[in-house]
Amino acid sequence: MRDYEQKMLQSQNYEDYFWESEDGLKLHCRDFPSDSDATPIICVPGLTRNARDFDHLGDWLDGSRRIIMVDLRGRGMSEYAKDSATYNPKTYVADIIGLMDKLKLPKAVFFGTSLGGIVTMIMAAAHPEKLAGALLNDIGPELDPAGLKRIGDYVGQGCSFDTWAHAARDLAESSGDIFPDFTLKDWIAFAKKIYTMNNSGRIKLDYDMKISEPFDSKGGGSGILWKALESLESTPTLILRGELSDLFSANVALKMLEILKQGVLVTVPRVGHAPTLEEPIALEAIDALLKRIA
């Protein structure tokens, strides 16, 4: 067992923090505090994911740097939106700016997985002064239609299970190609990040099914996102790509390096979309990124 996993078993090292969005939603994040003056990290999860995806990083950092994991509106412990049209990156950026204002954070290192990486790029374009560094996890300005179709086929499709083992087996069947080396124990841990137990004791997805309504599955490149990426030109940036990713191609990743003067690309072997950030090679790359940022 890795040291940070043991710490997770011993205690809860974070605080739950809530703030209100401009349209009155109660939003949530997990805040792992630190006595360090180092620039804090803000983690932004993928489309159907939540703050729990990043918990291990809080224990891995072990207080050396403050790290905050956001539940985007409609996910985890954040309130569901009254208008599904607000499930879009520009609104997520506004929500996170509100959080930074509440916490009096002038800037942060942004860790964005998938949708969270899109939010990070748009944040860089709209508020470049807020970013001290960036991790773009298996995401770029141009997306493969095959991966988007796969995501579009499952997002918003509600399902529930009797036990965590049932949920884990279903994930193993549907996502085995993404994590071919996962054991049953890994799948159960993965399920506990994606699902939650409802009041009836059923295991259900931990997000608002309406997040699927604004979802665009056409794929291709986005001129807006390529332009947004230019805002990270001189910012220390780590690009992680899953070797087996069906959403983020190697060609797009290399094209991004032509723009990012301080960009570093690391490929995570035998992983699809998206790396969990628990892989040793991912943690080594994250450590190297943070050493470049005060």
Residues of each region from the PLM?
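Alpha/beta-hydrolase fold catalytic core
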Residues: 1-41, 63-64, 105, 287-294
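Conserved HGGG/HGGXW glycine-rich cap/lid loop of the alpha/beta-hydrolase fold
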Residues: 25-80
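Active-site loop/oxyanion-hole signature of alpha/beta-hydrolase fold enzymes
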Residues: 56, 69-111
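Short beta-to-alpha linker loops that shape the active-site pocket of alpha/beta-hydrolase fold enzymes
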Residues: 71-76, 140, 271-272
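Conserved hydrolase catalytic core segment
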Residues: 106-145
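Conserved alpha/beta-hydrolase catalytic His-Asp/Glu region
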Residues: 162-216
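Conserved serine/cysteine hydrolase catalytic core
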Residues: 198-258
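Catalytic histidine-centered segment of alpha/beta-hydrolase-like enzymes
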Residues: 271-280
